[in-house]
Amino acid sequence: MKYWLKKSSWLLAGSLLSTPLAMANEFSASFKGTDIQEFINIVGRNLEKTIIVDPSVRGKVDVRSFDTLNEEQYYSFFLSVLEVYGFAVVEMDNGVLKVIKSKDAKTSAIPVLSGEERANGDEVITQVVAVKNVSVRELSPLLRQLIDNAGAGNVVHYDPANIILITGRAAVVNRLAEIIRRVDQAGDKEIEVVELNNASAAEMVRIVEALNKTTDAQNTPEFLKPKFVADERTNSILISGDPKVRERLKRLIKQLDVEMAAKGNNRVVYLKYAKAEDLVEVLKGVSENLQAEKGTGQPTTSKRNEVMIAAHADTNSLVLTAPQDIMNAMLEVIGQLDIRRAQVLIEALIVEMAEGDGINLGVQWGSLESGSVIQYGNTGASIGNVMIGLEEAKDTTQTKAVYDTNNNFLRNETTTTKGDYTKLASALSSIQGAAVSIAMGDWTALINAVSNDSSSNILSSPSITVMDNGEASFIVGEEVPVITGSTAGSNNDNPFQTVDRKEVGIKLKVVPQINEGNSVQLNIEQEVSNVLGANGAVDVRFAKRQLNTSVMVQDGQMLVLGGLIDERALESESKVPLLGDIPLLGQLFRSTSSQVEKKNLMVFIKPTIIRDGVTADGITQRKYNYIRAEQLFRAEKGLRLLDDASVPVLPKFGDDRRHSPEIQAFIEQMEAKQ
């Protein structure tokens, strides 16, 4: 009875000492002679966890803590106490804890961690560790010596995947995983470089890999399998693996790396896209650099004789002669340069709108008898030329006496000669508007009045397709003759003129460059020009609008390149001094011209990247169908004066790619059903 009271008093004391001391869930962990099952119950109650205790768990707990513990520390303390007494805690999926013997824990449903996952404390876990460079078959026995195999610890390995499974307390498992990580790194440095003098590194790797394949290769761990990498830049082979295997492979490589019986290595490379002549200079520069880096110590002339690069234009191919290492480098360069280059469709819109109003009113005076004139340069016609033309246009009458053979007077005959209107027509041809001539005695007045109203709206849409980084030029216009000089003969009997021709119209020059992200950089030179005034070879004036720029545009995006807005108000007046200033009457001695002009010019551009034949075919079909639709519209309207005439029309797009009659009939039948 006394023994029972004594035992109960100790249990009560342990319970009081382990109760929370504050609302912050701090615990005092001191137990003396407490039954282990009671100890487990106290901890479960304090942590509010459900704990299932194996019936084989028996004993007493003696432990003292002088510091208060928080909830996490208290749980770690609980695990450590059970570990000391040979028990372990296994947490199930539903959060319930099981307390069992340590040796039984490794066969229970304990947590499984892999990769960088980690656990702490004395919790029993299983860690999966992947080993890359060391054989797990050799590593496992070493690890078993560092773990409690009689308790919860255990180490097993799986050869095909070269992995290790470690079961035990979390702290011990973490320590073994760290040991594996450090040991596994040592294998990464076991790499040897074998330089080749004659053979090609890539070809040597292919041969050695074929010879190294054995019947038991599938059962060999990945770590023990040798690995080969060809470094074509230095023409060497990198070998990793077991030292004995590496040594055997090095001997094999040296036996194969011998000089060829026939010196020289010739190769003909047929190009698919690049131009052979363009690649010759590039390859010569590459080969010279490779020979300089190789540094064989041979004379410069000997080195150059080793490499020969020529282009065969008829077959668009390259003929190469070089040592194997340089040959491989040049073939790699050719493979990277001989690619299908993208194309760019450049569509431009040039919009020019102009309107103008003007009026001209003037009076000119002239006298044939005295030769006096009052004329102005802004009227378009000179009264002097008009007066001369009028005088030459008059009929002339002549009277002539007629005599017989004996010189006897018979009669007078009168003949009238028609006037010459050539001079008058030339003078009047330059008149615009209305011109009225009034004769007052010897003086003649020429009144000229004209009013003009002009408006134009010009839309030009040139388009051109060009290769990436290629230059394309486009011109639509005409060549205008311009006199550049004149020379007379020695006796002024054979004068001649030198004439140059100037291109006038719409010019477009583009160099596109496709950049990352389907953006296109465009270097553009654009010009719009036309002839001003009479279309002759003397005093020809040209109007030119030119734009030079470099822009970045997204694929399929339209961008405005520039514009010009020009407004002019012009007024000119020519008059006779003093007389032209007289009110009202002064209008008879002056010529006035007023003009208002307004021009708008805008240039837009849109690039479209064409990377394949499908895109090119779609763009071509769109343009083709547009022209064909215009022709069909005109054909439907017909010709006004030729009812029976037929208007030519393009065939349907794709008719040139028709199939055999049987297949084509089937396709047309299916299209008709749709």
UniProtKB/Swiss-Prot annotation:
Residues 1-24 form the signal peptide. It is found in: Cell outer membrane. One of its GO terms (cellular component) is cell outer membrane. The record marks G477 as: May serve as a pivot that allows opening of the central gate for substrate egress. Changing G477A: Decreased complex assembly; complex is partially open. InterPro entries: Bact_Secretion_Sys_Channel, GspD-like_N0, GspD/PilQ, NolW-like, NolW-like_sf, T2SS/T3SS_dom, T2SS_GspD, T2SS_GspD_CS. Residues 395-417 are annotated as: Cap gate. Residues 188-261 are annotated as: N2. Residues 614-674 are annotated as: S domain. GO terms for biological process: protein secretion; protein secretion by the type II secretion system. Residues 264-338 are annotated as: N3. Residues 123-187 are annotated as: N1. The N0, N1, N2 and N3 domains are periplasmic, while the secretin and S domains form a channel that is partially inserted in the outer membrane. The cap gate extends out on the extracellular side of the channel partially closing the channel. The secretin domain forms a double beta-barrel structure; the outer barrel has an outer diameter of about 110 Angstroms while the inner barrel forms the central gate with a small pore in the closed state. This is Secretin GspD. It comes from Vibrio cholerae serotype O1 (strain ATCC 39315 / El Tor Inaba N16961).
